[in-house]
Amino acid sequence: EINLSVICGGKYSNMFYAFLSQLQTKHSTDNINPDYLIDYPGFSSIYNIPLNIPYFENDGSWLGIDFRGENELEAHENAIKLARLITSKIEQIANTQSQSTIVIFIPNEWQNFENFINKEESFDLHDYVKAFAASKGIATQLIREKTLEDSLTCQINWWLSLSFYVKSLRTPWILNNQEKNTAYAGIGYSVSKIKDKSEIVIGCSHIYDSNGQGLKYKLSKIDNYFLDKQNNPFLSFKDAFQ
């Protein structure tokens, strides 16, 4: 079975529970994106495994979170305060629910606290929470309020169900007729946007075999990079080899 835990503001709990519960039911494509989208038949029908969604009343796997920015604080101070509140809730769940993906509801009212850039640092709430959880081996899924308002219900349920399945460390499919000695690597980067500071590029790669197994991550600072005409950073031969 696949277990979810939830962090959600009290006044949104009913709405968010109803949204997550849609994963258990059928949804038609309504002829939207017919080239690649098919009807969603329900989580257990697709993956042949139950999905356990906690109820928002009297369940330790569903934690409330209430945050309002304080007027006497700067926007970036409120942003950090919110991020630390969320990570404290993640730790609280992780201490009792070790085998679950933690779903975090991000309401529109938190929009002003989701990111900032000043002379000292740049901040992104999504990245902060993801980095914190990843460092502790905790799977998370952030869902913004606007996702609940999106009309592409079938597509969203496919995307979300696959995300929960994969984050439970299961493999949804493998490719046929792949070379056994083939390996795959994905590389990403992050460029600092802080003014008056040199650009910082972080190389993030994941490596896995031809069956999509043996996934490994590597995160490291890259010093000897060069920029193309579009200012996209590329690894030097030495960094790429390492």
Model-assigned labels for residue ranges:
Residues E1-Q242:
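Long, low-complexity, intrinsically disordered terminal regions
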